[in-house]
A protein has these predicted regions:
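N-terminal, Lys/Arg-enriched amphipathic/low-complexity engagement segments
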Residues: 1-44, 59
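A broadly conserved detector of short glycine/acidic/proline-rich loop/turn motifs that flank catalytic sites
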Residues: 16, 35, 49, 96, ...
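Structured core elements
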Residues: 30, 42-44, 67, 91, ...
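Generic structural motif
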Residues: 35-39, 51-54, 63-64, 68-78
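Aromatic/His-enriched, Gly/Pro-containing loop or helix-boundary segments
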Residues: 39-40, 61, 101-106
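Acidic, glycine-anchored pre-beta loop/turn
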Residues: 45-51, 80-83
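Short hydrophobic beta/alpha edge segments that flank linear recognition/processing sites
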Residues: 52-64, 88-96
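Buried, small/hydrophobic-residue-enriched core segments of structured protein domains
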Residues: 80-150
Length: 150
C-alpha cells in the first residue's frame, strides 16, 4: 500500500496547450434499457420518425406520467427488442442541424415539477432502497444529494 501525505509532485515537463481541438462529431445516440431498472416503455415514436432534442420518446407503463426524452435531435433509426418484445434500446441518428424543445419554467413548485417531468429530468431522481424512478405524485420524506460520481 502506498500512502501519500501533503501531495505528490509529478515530473511532467511542459505546460498544457490552451486550444480546443475539433473532435469527430457523434453520429448516433441510444437509450439503453439497462440504464432504467424495472421500466416498461410505451413508445410514443416510431422508426423513421424525426425527433427533436428533449422530445418525449416513451412513457413508463408502470409509472404513468414519467417520460423519457430524446438526448439529441435526429431520426429514430431502430427500436430494438429482445425476448418477449422486451425493450433493449432505441437508436437515433443525429442530424447536422439539431432542433430542440424549449422548456419554460417559473418559480412555482408545480411549474418546476412539470418542467422536470416534461423534460425527462424526473428520471434522475431515485427512490430508496430499490433505486427506482419515483412516481410523479409521490412526496419524499427526505432528499439525499450525492456529489460524487460513482
Amino acid at each position: 500500500m502506498i500512502k501519500i501525505s501533503k501531495g505528490l509532485d509529478l515530473p511532467i515537463s511542459g505546460s498544457p496547450i490552451n486550444t480546443i481541438s475539433d473532435e469527430p462529431k457523434v453520429s448516433s445516440v441510444a437509450l439503453l434499457s439497462n440504464d432504467f431498472i424495472g421500466m416498461k416503455p410505451t413508445m410514443l415514436v416510431k422508426e423513421g420518425e424525426t425527433v427533436k432534442a428533449g422530445q418525449k420518446i416513451f412513457e413508463d407503463k408502470k409509472n404513468n406520467g414519467v417520460y423519457f426524452t430524446s438526448p439529441a435531435g435526429g431520426i429514430v433509426k431502430d427500436i430494438n427488442r429482445g425476448d418477449k418484445r422486451r425493450f433493449l434500446s432505441i437508436e437515433i441518428d443525429i442530424k447536422d442541424t439539431e432542433e430542440f424543445i424549449n422548456f419554460d419554467m417559473d418559480d412555482s413548485v408545480d411549474q418546476i415539477k412539470d418542467c422536470l417531468i416534461d423534460s425527462g429530468l424526473w428520471n434522475a431522481f431515485r427512490t430508496r432502497p430499490f433505486n427506482r424512478t419515483p412516481g410523479i405524485n409521490e412526496i419524499p420524506d427526505a432528499v439525499f444529494i450525492n456529489c460524487c460520481d460513482s
